[in-house]
A protein has these predicted regions:
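A beta-strand edge to alpha-helix "cap/lid" segment located at domain peripheries
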Residues: 1-38, 45-158
């Protein structure tokens, strides 16, 4: 007998995953390793745009110091798309980032797909995969979900 699958696209499930996505990003910007560790599956793997794979321990070590607000002066989340199929969820978004190096600012975008598994009553991220985005495929500003400037979450206009 198969276990019953969750209501795939219920508003509650989507809201829960949207909140996890916001927490995932906030954990990165604030270097909150403990909070981030709590949402990762024990078998978590990270896949970089280069194809390099990092296990959970390597990823969390990197996570502790990866965001420097003096270098990453702008960060946003945009074009969020969440799909749920049974006990698996794909959380996709794009980050726009502006990095300051040697007095120059360089802006780019990276798309990510975080794969969540619903297990033991909770969603846990089992894989995060990053993909560089070519300028001709940049999502529009009207899809922005959240903005961080110098590591501080900005209030959204209503």
């Amino acid at each position: 007998m198969q276990p019953a699958l969750r209501n795939q696209q219920s508003a509650g499930t989507i809201d829960e995953l949207r909140a996890l996505n916001a927490r995932f990003i906030h954990n990165f910007v604030t270097s909150d390793v403990a909070s981030h560790d709590a949402i990762l599956h024990p078998c978590f793997i990270n896949i970089w745009p280069t194809g390099q794979r990092w296990d959970r321990a390597t990823y969390l070590k990197y996570w502790a110091t990866a965001f420097d607000p003096d270098v990453i002066v702008y960060w946003d989340v945009r074009d969020e798309l969440i799909t749920v199929v049974g006990d698996v969820a794909l959380v996709r978004s794009t980050n726009k980032h502006t990095r300051r190096r040697d007095g120059n600012e360089v802006t780019g975008m990276t798309m990510y797909t975080d794969t969540y598994l619903f297990e033991n009553g909770a969603w846990k991220c089992i894989q995060a995969q990053l993909t560089a985005v070519a300028p001709e495929h940049y999502p529009a500003d009207d899809t922005i979900v959240s903005v961080y400037i110098a590591g501080k979450l900005q209030a959204r206009a209503k």
